[in-house]
């Protein structure tokens, strides 16, 4: 199968996708009513898109192409208002978080959609288990070769993005001991983790052609890599973040990725090499397991450093780019988060340690998303 040409887009433009939990009070389990909710909101939207994602307990909010985080925030805020209004009318709740803390995957209904039904046929129960919730950020690129360079550059910071956004410590009623348990769900997929090594767009087109021989890949959307190029949009898509509990944090994460992309493409601080990925999965695991307390290991020198410290260094490096893009508020907020030493997974555990229940935790998450 031939790959589409890379669509030229304005560099550093943004698109944000948020996979939201549709909740059924008073049990605060996942609902199976996303279709009802989506039908109720479609006519009310003025910008962006609201659509299905895998199962009937998931709802995806997606912005259009945005020039900066302020425009993205305005679109997401408008969608949030419409969704919350419709959810209230249908006695449903909406919240973020990378996993629902006590839902049972066996109860999840895959959407009546040709693509998702085909995916269910290919992957079986793994698709129902993939009822987890992430934030994806698209960044515009001028051409395919820039997209491949950007993908490799951003891959250096996958642990940082995971640790900052980690919000999935609980699954199936248990504390997983992970800050981000969501990404473990995809470990059984044949395309889990980093994209196979290529050095330019021509090589990527050849890779995609060979992957299509498996009969499991019909489009880029069928690839579950941590970061992937999206030629139809002319973007690189970062896919490792848990959906945050607040819109503000989602915007901050998008601002960081946009600023990092600008820094990478203007400064070119790395010469991508295949060996860069030698310890990729080990460092990724550290971020998932321990969050900002994880330890990164340099694939070349063996040097080890705290993820929190390296994240502060990243934030310092991208600050000039953030100022140019109007994303400096995002960098400031994330710097404060790192210095305080926490993420949303830590907040969730503190809620339970203070005597809260998992049902109460989901209720609290719905209240947080609704701004209560």
Curated annotation (Swiss-Prot):
GO terms for biological process: modified amino acid biosynthetic process. Its EC number is 6.3.2.2. GO terms for molecular function: ATP binding; glutamate-cysteine ligase activity. It is an enzyme of class 6 (ligase). It catalyses: L-cysteine + L-glutamate + ATP = gamma-L-glutamyl-L-cysteine + ADP + phosphate + H(+). Keywords: ATP-binding, Ligase, Nucleotide-binding. ATP-dependent carboxylate-amine ligase which exhibits weak glutamate--cysteine ligase activity. Belongs to the glutamate--cysteine ligase type 2 family. YbdK subfamily. Homodimer. This is Putative glutamate--cysteine ligase 2. It comes from Salmonella choleraesuis (strain SC-B67). The gene is ybdK.
């Amino acid at each position: 199968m031939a790959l589409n040409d890379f669509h030229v887009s304005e560099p550093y433009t943004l698109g944000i996708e948020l996979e939201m939990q549709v909740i059924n009070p008073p049990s605060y389990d996942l609902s199976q009513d996303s279709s009802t909710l989506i039908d109720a909101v479609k006519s009310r939207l003025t910008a962006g898109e609201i659509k299905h994602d895998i199962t009937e307990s998931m709802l995806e909010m997606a912005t259009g192409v945005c020039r900066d985080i302020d425009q993205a925030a305005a679109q997401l805020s408008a969608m949030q208002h419409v969704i919350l209004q419709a959810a209230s009318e249908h006695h449903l709740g909406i919240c973020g978080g990378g996993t629902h803390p006590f839902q049972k995957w066996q109860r999840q209904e895959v959407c009546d959609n040709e693509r998702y039904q085909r995916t269910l046929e290919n992957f079986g129960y793994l698709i129902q288990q993939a009822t987890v919730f992430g934030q994806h950020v698209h960044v515009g690129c001028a051409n395919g070769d820039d997209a491949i360079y950007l993908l490799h550059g951003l891959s250096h910071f996958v642990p940082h993005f995971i640790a900052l956004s980690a919000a999935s410590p609980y699954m199936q009623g248990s504390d997983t001991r992970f800050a981000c348990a969501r990404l473990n769900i995809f470990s059984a997929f044949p395309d889990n983790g980093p994209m196979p090594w290529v050095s330019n767009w021509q090589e990527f087109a050849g890779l995609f052609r060979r992957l299509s021989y498996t009969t499991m890949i019909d489009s880029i959307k069928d690839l579950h890599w941590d970061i992937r190029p999206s030629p139809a949009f002319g973007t690189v898509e970062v896919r490792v973040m848990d959906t945050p509990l607040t819109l503000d944090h989602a915007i901050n994460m998008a601002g960081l990725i946009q600023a990092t992309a600008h820094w990478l493409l203007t400064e070119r601080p790395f010469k991508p090499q295949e060996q860069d990925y030698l310890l990729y999965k080990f460092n990724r695991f550290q971020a998932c397991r321990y969050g900002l307390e994880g330890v990164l290991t340099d694939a070349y020198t063996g040097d080890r450093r705290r993820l929190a410290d390296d994240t502060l260094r990243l934030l310092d490096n991208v600050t000039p780019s953030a100022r140019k893009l109007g994303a400096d508020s995002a960098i400031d907020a994330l710097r404060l988060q790192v210095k305080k030493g926490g993420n949303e997974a830590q907040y969730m555990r503190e809620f339970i340690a203070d005597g809260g229940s998992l049902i109460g935790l989901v209720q609290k998450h719905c209240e947080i998303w609704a701004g209560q």
